[in-house]
């Protein structure tokens, strides 16, 4: 009975189109749909570097240096969009990537001074890119401002063919906000715990049909959960785009970030994670020296992106970027808890670093067909120069401090 029942349904389904075919043909009126993929003339929404409507990006340049649909790339690429960062209220790049598979974002805890991710088990501090250019640093890592970026893209797995020497775990590319040839104004103010006050703005406009501009800025005064550890920042990122015709585009971008973020120093295990005969050590305890410990950094970028399409088959692109990091740091770090379970040994650390980096990337993209197959080929030549000046001093001694009755100002430091 079950077999007959299935055959009867199949027969009925075959008969339906035959019955419909026998009816008279009805001609419907023509409907014309008009629209544009961008936001006005020269719009950038939905492109590989422009804003994304929602959480799901469809295009990327990180995986191939060509604007390519994500679904067509063999690599594993995760994209965190501006909308997702805003809805989650992220405060740093680590929080933005917390839900990205294969990425450990804060292996040293929430240290406001720097961002030190791990991708697929490999340290990726030296695999950070800004607009496709590698961020070069030594000791002076940096905590980038997420509000200044349109998207954060993680390419997992080796990428040396496109980007040169790097960690096998993958890279993180931070894509800066650019002009969109639309008018918008966004001004926000935030108040949070730990005396956190933030003011930020994102303003864009159109000067004429060929020129668009954008300015992103942020100012922050903030303490942290640990006493005497501040997390202050000033950030500015201007940009301007010039598009004289449909085939030519030139975008000039810059950014300047000043951070005054102190080191959390650290706390002993006995009294925090484990028990201590003298009681619990509060997470707000500061074991450094407020009048000695200091950390500040200046970080700036300036660069451009130029593209010209000669015809439907050939396009030339040239991107260049200069970055400068000036990092100054001195600190008494926690070096161990004594056998008495309350005396904390401390050691001095003084670091000064100045890094200058310049890179230029030339690309020629060609499109051609062989029979029914369509091809896109990329030929490129890039140049990079890095200069690093660094001084480090770990010599000297410092007086210990009582973890349960700290007295600051008793500093003995000799270098």
What are the residue ranges of the model-derived segments?
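Non-catalytic regulatory/gating segments with a bias toward low-complexity or hydrophobic composition
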Residues: 77, 85, 97, 152-157, ...
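Outer-membrane beta-barrel translocator/receptor signature
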Residues: 147-150, 161-238, 244-248, 300
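Transmembrane beta-barrel strands of outer-membrane/channel proteins
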Residues: 187-191, 215-219, 252-258, 318-324, ...
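Outer-membrane beta-barrel channels and translocator barrels
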Residues: 208-210, 243-247, 311-313, 365, ...
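Acidic/polar loop-and-plug regions of large Gram-negative outer-membrane beta-barrel proteins
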Residues: 220-224, 234-309, 313, 324-355, ...
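Short acidic/polar hinge/loop motifs at secondary-structure boundaries
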Residues: 105, 116, 133-156, 175-176
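Short, acidic, small-residue-rich periplasmic hinge/interaction motif at the N-terminus
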Residues: 22-83
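Extracytoplasmic beta-strand/coil segments of soluble accessory domains associated
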Residues: 55-78, 82, 88, 94-134, ...
